[in-house]
Each structure stands twice: as structure tokens, then as C-alpha cells.
Amino acid sequence: IKPTTAVEKFNAKQFVKSYAKPYKNRSYRWHIVMYVSAFACMDMISALAVFYATDVWHGEKLFGMDISSMFIIAPLMVAAVVMFPLARKMMDKKSKQFAFRMGLPFYIFGGIMFAIMEPSWTPPILIPIVALIMGLGFGGAQMMPWIIFPDTVDVGEMATGDRSTGTYSGMMTLARKVGGALAVGLVGWILGWCGYKENNTGDTSVYIQQSDTALLAIRLVMGITVAVLIAIALYASFKYKVDNKKLARIRYFIDARKKGVDLSDEETAERDALVAELYGKVDEKDVVVPQVLDDEGNVVEVSDEKIDEEFGSAFGTVENDESENDKN
């Protein structure tokens, strides 16, 4: 009979600390801003497309069909798919954040055009054309955050010795869900404040005439949403500093630590500079002493002196209990 282990009590404080840990990583924070802004914008556009087509362009036809959200979403997605190979090429040639932001001006332009276009003077054919232009920025904005994510985990591992992929991924998903919920909710709240009339008849074929204020609100929210959120994402992409060259060095230092390779003074200084630039200040409580493996994959014991010599400069000096007591 195996002895039962003591049941650990749930520590809410420790739980919060462990899941807040990724946000100590400067590169991860900027990545989250890029990700949430781009995807929240997508959520709001998806929600507004129906109102925009059904209410703002009510009664207008294109190719013999009533204007619907299909004329917005379909061209948007087609252009996004076309941009994927180009984004991939620019990612390898330039950087991932460059591939993310290269089409964002088109995204912003498209949103502004949707805000200013109205049936009284705009040919309906401009709707899919503008959506197509917007999609040139939409593709990179949707694709690159997922490719950038592992690099932020690498930055964290270089700085602390801990590769908390699950925690980083969980907080990324949580931020996405919260941002998406607030974005879609905001659409409903704003339209409600502006006097949008709901269809309570139960018959979707019945059209409810909206006030000019509500129609203007739909157009303005469409434009302001894209302009503001994508501008934030664009700014964050410039603040995100991990490029291909730095990433290669980050992975070199991670691999060197795992293999117990001695770094030269120049390499140690380079690693410290990367940690300061890409991660920020390292909390000693977050530091995990990595296992050193030999060529056969066996764990090699490392002395405290070796740990302090190799990792102290980047992690903050690793001290044992005796040295701490001496200070006190």
C-alpha cells in the first residue's frame, strides 16, 4: 500500500504570482499588445460587418445581390491568404515584427474608408475593393503573433533559466479571450447608447429603420476601431526588439547554459545586455538553475561556485543560505 501524500492547500497568492510571471518579460508584454490589439480589432470588425452591410447599406445591391457582410469578410480573407507567403518571406529576410507591421497602413486606410463611405455618394463596388485593401494588412496581423510567441518564451528562458511555455501560452489565451469579449461587448454598448433599435419581432426578414445617429455610430466605430487598435499594434511592433540576429544569440546562450559551456567575458556581457534590453530586470525568485547535460544526455552536477560564476551576472548573484546569514 502506497502511503498517502499530504494534500496541498490552494495558495491563491502563489497562483497569481506564477501566472503574472510572463508579464515581467518586456518582449512578451509588447507581443501581447500586438496580439490582443490585432485580434480585438478583428472581433469588432466581424461584429460590425453585419450592422454595416445590413443597416448602413440597406437597399443597395451589388452584382444583383443585396449588400451583405459577405462582401466585406470574403475579400478580407482572400487578401489575407494571399499575404501569408509574402509575410513569411519578409519574416526570413527582415524580421517577424516587420512582417507583422508591413501591411498595417493598408489596414488602417481600409478602416477609415469604411467610416467615410456612405450610399449617397459611394459606388457599392468600393466595399469589396476596400475590404481587399484592408486584408493586405489583416494577413500579417493575424499570422505573425503566433510565430512571434515562441521567441518571447526563449527570452524568458535566457533570462531566468525557466521555459514556462504553458504559463506563457495560458496567459496569452486569457488575454485574447478577455480582449475579444470586451471588444465585442463594446460594439453592443456603443450602438445601444446611440439609439440602435433591435429587431424583437423574431423575423429576421423584417428591417428596422435606424436613426441617422445610429448609422453614423456604426460607420465611426468601424473606422475608429481599426485606426486606434491597429495604431496601437503598430506602435508595439516597433517596441518589440527581438530580431533574427538577436534570436540566434538568445538560442546560443540557452544551448550553452544547458551544455555547461563557459562563456567568455565578451559573451557574458552580450548576454547581460540582451537580458536587460529584451527581458528587463530579473527577479531572483524567478531564477531556475538549469540542468546541465553531457553529450549523452546525462545530468551533470554543477557546484554553487560554478552557478554563481556562469549565471550570477545575468540572474543576479545566486547566494546560499550561509552567505545570506553573514550579511545579516
Across the structure, where does each feature detected by a protein language model lie?
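Long, low-complexity, intrinsically disordered segments
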Residues: 297-328
